[in-house]
């Protein structure tokens, strides 16, 4: 019995180490999504002394932006830094998920093998792999949700307030990084109250609530400085203005909600999780306390899915927060099926088969993204823009260019997704928002020494070809400089 167990220990850590290395390499070489760029720009603005909401529009929870800003203050203002720490957080979430199964699954011969399957089912998930290492809050939320789950499971069997308070703090950190993860907070609190086995449940609930509140101190601070701005960025923008950039939003949302049918990974993971949940409820014979932990996975997955599904518009990556919890249930489902079809104490082949299927699904996703834009292309564009733009001159560009050139955007240009917001002028000024008409007026008045765009329609609408003497085309993008006699750029 010693040899296979030692072998599975090596396999457990070996497989997860190989995954972690590959994931880190991907994060530094190819990971990119356009939406991460305004998160990076927000971190850069924070380093310049500006406050989210108060000094610039940033319709996101602020904690992840402060996290990125802190690490960039130590290691430099580079997307490589943000990607590295997001990747490490995602790897941490995968390890927490795999380790939970390896420790808590009641069938000894399946603990380590199932842990490998569960960890790789989560880590090789296409959405987790593609979005986990980005500067957005995905990595932060994956890690804090997985950690809050682990702490909550431990807290119900122990007296005292420390573990519940820590669980609330970590769950609050997830919500403070992205409100898409906020649904986990009431689920964890309710579950701890219902299944508490030691100590005063009300004291624990109070500790959890206080911990959550502590995580929201940055939001409370910003609210005290600008309640109107904070309300707009965290609530009003999402309720009334997000859909401005997505026509036929309802149809789009329905297509996203049905897209799992076309995903082999989602189908496999979901079916295994469903079988796992049924096995826990009807066939396992496990102790009620252990069953409750797996039920918690189901409740978290359901609540987080509902939260992501009600976003308007929603996107497939919003659902990646459920992956660790669905993967745990899928590990149970894999055992339930394999133990009936194959030898119950020989998990090697089922684990290899499922891992291979998830790896193939990820491979297909990465192959389909092979021609997508990435940071290397923007670095070339930023270098040319720096070459032709005088220091401290005004630049008309988008978030990735502002970030890479380290040129602060003019007021109102910090978030390109805000120009369609239609509010009274005084409100727009308070919220640091300018309209598309105001953007056009500034560009055509000669306010910018250099202009950049990758959109032919925008180039024509702004009249950039007639405003500048010089033009350079790089890929699908164009850089304009050397203003004609229409005005001089503002200092």
Task: Label every PLM stretch briefly.
Residues 60, 180-181, 185, 224, ...:
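Extracytoplasmic
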Residues 84-108, 124, 147, 151:
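Transmembrane-helix motifs of polytopic, lipid-linked glycan transferases
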Residues 104-105, 109, 145-166, 193-196, ...:
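Membrane-interface transmembrane helices that cradle and orient dolichyl/undecaprenyl
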Residues 112-116, 151-172, 201-203, 292-301:
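Short hydrophobic alpha-helices at membrane interfaces in multi-pass membrane enzymes
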Residues 118-119, 161-179, 185-190, 213-214, ...:
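Membrane-interface alpha helices of multi-pass inner-membrane proteins
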Residues 132, 138-141, 146, 183, ...:
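Hydrophobic/aromatic-rich transmembrane helices and adjacent perimembrane loops
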Residues 184-213, 278-287, 328, 334-343:
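Perimembrane helix-loop-helix junctions
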Residues 204-245, 303-306, 310, 401:
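Membrane-lumen/periplasm interface segments of specific transmembrane helices
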